[in-house]
Amino acid sequence: MPGCPCPGCGMAGPRLLFLTALALELLERAGGSQPALRSRGTATACRLDNKESESWGALLSGERLDTWICSLLGSLMVGLSGVFPLLVIPLEMGTMLRSEAGAWRLKQLLSFALGGLLGNVFLHLLPEAWAYTCSASPGGEGQSLQQQQQLGLWVIAGILTFLALEKMFLDSKEEGTSQAPNKDPTAAAAALNGGHCLAQPAAEPGLGAVVRSIKVSGYLNLLANTIDNFTHGLAVAASFLVSKKIGLLTTMAILLHEIPHEVGDFAILLRAGFDRWSAAKLQLSTALGGLLGAGFAICTQSPKGVVGCSPAAEETAAWVLPFTSGGFLYIALVNVLPDLLEEEDPWRSLQQLLLLCAGIVVMVLFSLFVD
């Protein structure tokens, strides 16, 4: 440019114009790409919403809705088996259990319960856990040493968990009436009523103040039953996912297997300090675990129509079953067996041993002819 003192100033103008035009073109392209990006994002969100709606639609479709209803009803029937012991155990909490005859009848039931617990662990829960682990192995091969060790570790974890819970929560004592001991309750009542006593003396000393002790072992047994019912819900729902016929057969098999088991659990709750109706209500509350298990099995079912239990449900059952086994072993060997070892009469000890074997034999028969 003439008159400009700076060398090369003539080239600065065209360069400036070129850069300005390039910047404007980039801005126009960016502005034009924003609608495309927005449309792509909208399309992706729509696809995700469609997939979610399709999954919920498949989960609540007509065929799957029948599976939901049948599975929940089957799991509820298994949970309602907890009221069966009310029909076969004529024991009441109170004076009858404190009598010698009532205590002996309870020990007989506990002997049967011990055999049922051991049979349930070694003939039902652990074999089922091994079966789930084998089915989860790649290629359908057998269990590896590491998988077997994991099952053993889960059993130990169940035992230690129940031990820690019993250490943490000490036995709670509920006193119906807390009074200072008085040698002559009639005289005390007369003093409070101006010298006139209208109360009759108790027929038996010691019945005026009722002290009821609820042991932690009862709550631990309820926890183990809830987890056990969760696995039953998994099995019932997985069977109904295959067909209604297999689902009904599985439900009936679990019901037949649970009846002697519920009788033993009922005896353990009576031993822990619950009365008959409280024990029955708490047994019914464990049915919630079965409903949760059935819902979990159906919700984790593969949407591609693969029958049977989903991999997530199989993996859950593979550790829940041995963990529950450890809990039942702890209850049987730590809470029930010591009471039976206190018996010194040889004839009664033999009866307890025979009842223990009877509980195991019942579980063997159900495992052979039902499962």
Curated annotation (Swiss-Prot):
Membrane topology per record: Multi-pass membrane protein
Reaction equation(s) it catalyzes: Zn(2+)(in) = Zn(2+)(out)
Motif (XEXPHE-motif): 257-262
GO MF annotation list: protein homodimerization activity; zinc ion transmembrane transporter activity
Keywords, ordered alphabetically: Cytoplasmic vesicle, Ehlers-Danlos syndrome, Endoplasmic reticulum, Golgi apparatus, Ion transport, Membrane, Transmembrane, Transmembrane helix, Transport, Zinc, Zinc transport
Pfam families: Zip
Segments on the Cytoplasmic side according to the record's topology features: 29-68, 130-149, 257-278, 338-349
Lumenal compartment spans: 1-7, 90-108, 171-235, 300-316, 371
Description of what induces expression: Up-regulated under zinc-limiting conditions. Induces by TGFB1.
GO annotation terms (biological process): brown fat cell differentiation; connective tissue development; intracellular zinc ion homeostasis; zinc ion transmembrane transport; zinc ion transport
Superkingdom of the organism of origin: Eukaryota
GO cellular component, one term: membrane
Transmembrane segments: 8-28, 69-89, 109-129, 150-170, 236-256, 279-299, 317-337, 350-370
Localization of this protein: Golgi apparatus membrane; Cytoplasmic vesicle membrane; Endoplasmic reticulum membrane
Database matches in InterPro entries: ZIP
Family: Belongs to the ZIP transporter (TC 2.A.5) family.
Annotated PANTHER family: ZINC TRANSPORTER SLC39A7 HISTIDINE-RICH MEMBRANE PROTEIN KE4 (PTHR16950), ZINC TRANSPORTER ZIP13 (PTHR16950:SF16)
Subunit details: Homodimer.
Disease connection: Ehlers-Danlos syndrome, spondylodysplastic type, 3: A form of Ehlers-Danlos syndrome, a group of connective tissue disorders characterized by skin hyperextensibility, articular hypermobility, and tissue fragility. EDSSPD3 is an autosomal recessive form characterized by a generalized skeletal dysplasia involving mainly the spine and striking clinical abnormalities of the hands, in addition to classic features of Ehlers-Danlos syndrome.
Known role: Functions as a zinc transporter transporting Zn(2+) from the Golgi apparatus to the cytosol and thus influences the zinc level at least in areas of the cytosol. May regulate beige adipocyte differentiation.
Protein name (database record): Zinc transporter ZIP13
